[in-house]
From Swiss-Prot:
Coiled coil: none annotated. InterPro entries: GK/Ca_channel_bsu, Guanylate_kin-like_dom, Guanylate_kinase_CS, Kinase-like_dom_sf, L27_C, L27_dom, MAGUK, P-loop_NTPase. Residues 310-320 are annotated as: Calmodulin-binding. Residues 318-366 are annotated as: Disordered. One of its GO terms (cellular component) is cell-cell junction. Keywords: Calmodulin-binding, Repeat, SH3 domain. One of its GO terms (biological process) is positive regulation of vulval development. GO terms for molecular function: ATP binding; calmodulin binding; insulin-like growth factor receptor binding; protein tyrosine kinase activity; signaling receptor binding. Gene3D superfamilies: 2.30.42.10, L27 domain, P-loop containing nucleotide triphosphate hydrolases, Phosphorylase Kinase, domain 1, SH3 Domains, Transferase(Phosphotransferase) domain 1. This is Protein lin-2.
Amino acid sequence: MRELDPDESNLLLDEQLSIRDVIEQGPFSNVYRILHGPSNRKFLLRSINLNLFRQHTGLGFEEIDEEIRICQNLQHPYICRLEKTINSVHYRHIIFENMEGNDICFEIVQRASNGFVFSEYVVSHYTRQLLDALDYCHTRKIVHRDVRPHNLVLASKDTSAPLKLCGFGVAKDLSEIGGSMACGRVGVPQFMAPEIVRKDRVSCSSDIWSSGVVLFLLLAGRLPFSGSTSDIYERIMQTDVDVDGYMPNISESARNLVRRMLNADPSKRISAKEALNHEWIRDKEHMASRKHMNDVIDQMRRYNESRKLKSNVLSAVNSGRFDETTPRQDTPQTAFVDGSSPGGDCCHRGESSSNDAAEPPADKDLSGAYKVLGSLDAINSLLDPNSYKPGSTTFQKIHDDGSVRNLLRLYDKIKALPCEPVVTEVDTSTLRKETLNQIDGLLGPSPEALELRQLLNSPHLASCVQALDVVVCEIRDPKNEASGSGDKEGNCVSSDPAPAYLNGGVLPLGAQRAGTSFEHFNQSAVHTSYDEEEEELYDCMSRLRLVQFQKDTQEPMGITLKVNEDGRCFVARIMHGGMIHRQATLHVGDEIREINGMSVANRSVESLQEMLRDARGQVTFKIIPSYRSAPPACEIFVRAQFDYEPSQDDLIPCPQAGIPFKTGDILQVISKDDHNWWQARFVSSFPSIGNSSNAQRSNQQQVAGLIPSPELQEWRTACLAMERSKNTCNTHCMWFNKKKKYYTTKYLQKHSALFDQLDLVTYEEVMRLSQYRRKTLVLLGAHGVGRRHIKNTLIHRHPNRFAYPIPHTTRPPRKDEVDGKHYYFVTNEQMMADIQNNEYLEYGTHEESMYGTKLETIRNIHKSGKIAILDVEPQALKVLRTAEYSPFVVFIAAPNLQGMQDPDGSLEKLLNESDVLRQAFGHLFDFIITNSDIDDTIAQLERLVEKLPAYPQWLPVTWVY
C-alpha cells in the first residue's frame, strides 16, 4: 500500500499522533510506529485502506470490524493490546501498544549472536507464554488461525521481555457458531493444520497445530514442510512429520510434546490447557535441557535470511515504487494478495476466491517477483536433508524446473563479476524526472539534449530505473544494512558526505575519475592474459580502495596496527566507540598501503601509530580490504569475578587501552573478536544495586577498552597456581592447601565436581532487572564475627518476614523438645538415604549424631512467603546460588583492628580468616558490611532487605532463563 493520504495524516495530527517509522508494507494496509506528542509514548498503527481491502480480498468491512471487536475483548499479558481505533471514510486506523522487539525467530538469533544461551529451557519458556495466550483465547472460543513467528513478537529488546501474540486479522469468534466453522485455506501454508488444507471444519485445535509447527521450528531451526505450496499441502495432508530425524539431540519430552501438537486428528490433538500441564512445560527446571543449541541457531539464521528477503520482495511489490512507471487510474495497485505469492509469506484468507496459489499471477508485473520467491522456496528445499531421502521427489522436481536453473545461473554470473556495485541513496526515478523537466525547460535544446530526452523516455530505461530503485530502496534497504556511524560529532567527522567510492565502493576497472559515472566496463578485458606472477598485483589493484575522513581533534583514531614478516601493515583491532568504529571506514584485517600518500611498507608499528596520532585535517588511507565477513555484534553484561589492573599486566598489547576493574564490577562486553582480549565498557562498581553507578567513570569509558578473555585469565591463573605449588614453603601454597581442606567441611559431595575449578572464575553473565524478589538471605563471615546473633535478632524482630530452616538430626529428642519445632528427628538410615539422594544442603556429625539442613525445609519457607535466612559455610552457595533459591549474599566482614585492643590475638585471627574468605569467595558476594557495631549492622541489613525488592539488580542470566 502506498503512503497515507494527506487527509489521513491530518486526521492523525488532530489526535496529536505523528508517524515516526514504517514497520511493514502490505497490499492494503501499512504498519507504522507513531508517537503521541503530549505523553511522548510510542504506539503501533495499522492503517487499512478500505477500498484496497475490498478490491484485493473481495470481503466486506465487517471483517475489519470483527478483528477490532476481538482485539478489544482480549486483555492478556501475552497478547498485543489494542489501545484505540480511528475511523474515516476511506481508512480504519487501529492503534496497538508499542513493541520494540523483533519476532521470536529474529530475536533468538540476535540474542545468540550477542552471546546468550539458546536452549530447550528458553524454548520452553516462550512456548509456555504462547500456550498461555492461546488458552486464554480458546477459553473464549476465539481461534487465531494465523499463528506463526511473524505474529509472535517480543515486547521489547530487554532479555526478560515477554512474548506477545498479535496479528488477529483472520481470527474468528466461534462462541456463537458451535465452536467450529467451515472455511477455506486460511493462514500461511507451512503453518496450516491438515483440516484447514482439506477445507474441513476448523476449531481452536487448528491453532495448536500451528503452534506445534512453531515449536518444531524453534527446536530444529527449520520448518517441517518445505517446497512449493502444492508440495507443502501434499505433505501436510500426509502428516509426514519426521520429528526424530530433525531433532536427534532434543529431549524425548520435548519431542513428545511436538508429536502431540502435530497430531493429524484434531479430536486427539492436545489442547492448550493440556499442553501447559505437559512435563516439558510445567517442569522445565528438570525436563528442559540448558545446553546451547548452536546447530539450531545456524539453521534458524538461514530461515530468517530467506524470510527477510521474501519480506523485502513482497514489501517492494506492495510499495508505491513498483507502479511508478505504469500508473493506472482504473485498476488496483499491483500486489501479491490472498495467497497469490509463493512460499507462504502472505496470509491466505479462505473466504476469498483465489486462495490456492496453484498458478502464477496473471499480472505480468508480478511474474518476475513470483519466480524469485519460488526459487527461494526451491533453495530451501535443496537445503533440507529430507529432500534427498529415498522415495522423495523434491530434488528431481527442482532439478527439472528450468526457471530455477536459470536464476541460479544468473546468480553465479553475478558473483563471478570482478567488482561490486556502488550503492547510493539517490532516488534514480526522481533524478530521471528532474532531468526530463530541465530538458523540457530549455528554449533551444541541443541535439544531444533531445537524444538524452529520448533515451530517458524509453520504456526500457524507465523500467531499469524503476527496478534499480525497488532493489536499492525496498529490497536491499541500505539504511538497514549500513553499519551505522553512531556518533557524528562535528569536531571528529566531516559533515560533508564522502563520495561513494571513498566509503567502501570498489573502483571499477577502467574508471578514470571519481563520481557516479564511469567509462564502460568491457568484461572481455577481465580475461586478458597476464603472467601468473602478476596475478596477485592485478588482484590488489582491482580491490584497491580509498578511505577518507576528517580528524580535527586530539581524539585517538581507536585502531591498533600490526606489521607482518614481509613488512606489510594490517589493521589488528578496532576499538568500539572510537573514531574509526563510528565511521565504519576500516575493518579488522584490512591492509593499509598508504597514509596521506606516504607508503607504510617496512615501517615499525610505533612509527605508524605516531603518524596516526599526529595526523590532522583530511586523512586518506589507501587500503586493500580483507573482505572478511564482519563478526556478529556482541553486547552482553558480565560481573567481574577477579581484580584487574592493566598497568600491571605484562601480556596486554596496550596498557593504555585496558580497563581496570574490581571483583563485582559490572562490565558490558562489546566484542569477542580477539580470542585473548575482549573489548568492554565499564558500567557500574560493586555493589551494583539500585541506580547508583560510577557515572564519572562510565562517561570516561564511552570508548571500549581491553579486558582479558576468560580463556586467557584461566590460563594465567592456572600458571600462577602451578608456580606456587612448586615451592612448598611459600605461604600462598599453604593458603591453597588450607582452602582445599576447607572445602571438605559440611560440603555436599554431589555438587563438588561442578566446582572443581573454583579458582578459575573469570566473568559471570548477568542481566539487569528493574525489580526482583530474593527468596533467601545468606550471611557469610568468619566464625565469631556475629552472624548467629544477627540472624536471631532479625527473626525475633520480623517473624513474619524471616524464618530459619529447622535442622534434621538422628539423635533422640530431649525433654521438652518437639518434633518439627526444635528439630526434625529422623533415623540414621533415613538421613543417610536422603544424603545419598542429595537432599541436604549441608550436614555433619556431633557426638555420634548427625545434623543437617534439608533443602525441602528451605523450599517450605519460600512457599510460606517468608525469606529463608541462613548462616552457612561458603561452599553451600554452590547449591543455593540458583533461581530456585535466589539468594542475596551478605558478607559480614571483621572490623579493622585500628584503635582496638587485642591481648590474646583473637581479633587478628578473626580478621585474617575474614580476609581469606573474601579472597576465596568474594566473587559470590552481593553486599559487604563491616561489623564495627552489631546494632548498626543489623539496622543496615533491615533497611537493605526492606528496599531490595524495588531496586534494580544485576542477576545471573541463568536465574532468568
